[in-house]
């Protein structure tokens, strides 16, 4: 269901940036699970370029039972842009969950006006798709914006209206990146480094997909995937908190 979304992202990245592959730790780039009624595969890609220090995306194909496309794009540390976050999930034929967002690293008014306010027009344009629902796993006060596109919808809407919204969100993100002024001060850059590390730690500690990975591929593999690939700058709680 979400293959066109993956392919569109790949095409945009390849045509716009000088991509270099980043090594994914052994055994984490591809895996097959025979649990359940049919096999499920997970495959990941990871790249870098001068403007974007880490581009990662993952596709889970469980046939009619599960289709998941997840991506996070981290700007280079000399840019203070939000991260681009994509979560598209389908379980069965009727359960489709969509989350598209520019995930802010900071919450001050100037930052939000510069990077988040431009999203308003898209959120309003796709108000027929977006929903104001309780987001159990998405804290609007931490790394999520008030203009994120969050929706539970049907397959027809995903293929039509949601895909159009997705393309527009990506286009806006590329525009913000193209117009962003690189940081020159070492202290400012260190602030970005810390903010991106904090994002990884926050996300790894709360990632709602951890249980999904464990159910298909086992707990040990899921923990490696979480801390060695998805959020590699995070420290596992057992390591980061002595005495636990």
Curated annotation (Swiss-Prot):
Record keywords, A-Z: Oxidoreductase
Gene3D superfamilies, per the entry: 3.40.1500.20
Keyword Oxidoreductase: yes
Entry EC number(s): 1.3.7.2
Catalytic activity field: 15,16-dihydrobiliverdin + oxidized 2[4Fe-4S]-[ferredoxin] = biliverdin IXalpha + reduced 2[4Fe-4S]-[ferredoxin] + 2 H(+)
GO terms of biological process kind: phytochromobilin biosynthetic process
A family per Pfam: Fe_bilin_red
Name of the top EC class for this enzyme: oxidoreductase
Top-level taxon of origin: Bacteria
Keyword Nucleotide-binding tagged: no
One Gene Ontology term of the molecular function aspect: 15,16-dihydrobiliverdin:ferredoxin oxidoreductase activity
Residue ranges of the TM segments: none
Free-text function comment from the UniProt entry: Catalyzes the two-electron reduction of biliverdin IX-alpha at the C15 methine bridge.
NCBIfam families, alphabetized: PRK13247.1
Family membership: Belongs to the HY2 family.
Descriptive protein name: 15,16-dihydrobiliverdin:ferredoxin oxidoreductase
């Amino acid at each position: 269901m979400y293959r066109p979304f993956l392919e569109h992202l790949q095409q945009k990245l390849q045509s716009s940036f000088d991509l270099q592959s980043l090594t994914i730790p052994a055994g984490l780039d591809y895996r097959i699970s025979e649990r359940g009624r049919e096999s499920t595969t997970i495959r990941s890609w990871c790249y870098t370029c001068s403007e974007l220090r880490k581009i990662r995306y993952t596709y889970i194909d469980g046939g009619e039972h599960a289709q998941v496309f997840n991506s996070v794009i981290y700007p280079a540390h000399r840019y203070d842009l939000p991260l681009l976050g994509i979560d598209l999930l389908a379980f069965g034929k009727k359960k489709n969950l969509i989350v598209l967002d520019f995930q802010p690293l900071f919450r001050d008014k100037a930052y939000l006006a510069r990077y988040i306010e431009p999203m308003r027009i898209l959120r309003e344009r796709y108000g027929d798709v977006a929903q104001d629902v309780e987001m159990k796993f998405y804290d609007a006060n931490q790394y999520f914006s008030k203009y994120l596109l969050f929706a539970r919808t049907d397959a027809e809407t995903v293929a039509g209206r949601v895909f159009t919204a997705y393309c527009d969100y990506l286009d806006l993100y590329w525009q913000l990146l193209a117009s962003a002024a690189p940081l020159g001060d070492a202290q400012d850059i260190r602030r970005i480094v810390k903010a991106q590390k904090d994002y990884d730690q926050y996300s790894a500690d709360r990632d709602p997909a951890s249980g999904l990975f464990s159910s298909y591929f086992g707990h040990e593999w899921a923990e490696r995937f979480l801390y060695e690939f998805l959020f590699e700058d995070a420290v596992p709680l057992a390591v980061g908190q002595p005495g636990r």
